[in-house]
């Protein structure tokens, strides 16, 4: 009799526990869903190319892609949303802490962190290593270095900036597929440099003639906008290119696109971006023809770019072809 009564008393407790567990799970699902909607909204508003391309990302890796791209938008917009570089540096440190906690499995209640943590759990369930903390930090450091829009000393410095931002975002995306491939990373490096250089060129009018703070969007996904607390323009073409073309900042501010030498300077920088696209296409043709890429990857051996041994040349060629197809698919021939 006592046992039956005890059983009756315990049943509501088990029911409450079951309800509590279900409610917690439902809350977690809702939180991830809201984070996904937030990240999609950021891409739709500020980075329409990435929003379009997300349809080509495998469903199993799409949350990681959205989180990576939303992360890039948020840190790119820091300069546009703070009043001075000191506050901007504090925001960048917030993102370092956020990424560090997220990769350790302790994400803060921040939409990008929530979605990234969810994506990492999915990758880990498939036996994939975590995304590189160093790559995330590299993007943050590059953005922080140019918070106040200092000029690029030379064209090589602009390429380095593009490598540390746009190319590195592609490395993170490839890792999330998941794909670890020197060949795919090599192609991504050139595509990222072309994209980053083009982004700086396309952002040039906004930087030289900044609109009122916090009222502009970035539909082209550029993210290279002037600090929100300043109406002072900046010409961010490489100084060596400007000197060679005879471009002066004051002429650009006074005459805009008609400034002496400006078109020649822009053409020189754009040519470098186009060179990287040509190189990527040549690499693709070589690989499809069963040849090697044609030149060495300058970042081979660095973090995340370790070489894999395939045994013999034929296996290496086949692996490279499969990796490029998996990494870029229908996008590369375009």
Language-model features: where?
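Catalytic cores of Mg2+-dependent Asp-rich isoprenoid enzymes
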Residues: 2-7, 17-118, 138-139, 162-168, ...
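Alpha-helical ds-nucleic-acid-binding substructure associated with the helix-hairpin-helix region
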Residues: 115-155, 160-163, 265
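Helix-hairpin-helix/helix-loop-helix acidic hairpins
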Residues: 147-187, 281
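Active-site beta-strand/loop microenvironment that shapes enzyme catalytic pockets
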Residues: 175, 179-215
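Compositionally biased, non-globular sequence tracts
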Residues: 12-15
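Intrinsic-disorder/low-complexity, polar/charged segments
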Residues: 84, 88, 153-158, 181, ...
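Alpha-helix capping at helix-to-loop junctions
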Residues: 104, 125, 141, 145-149, ...
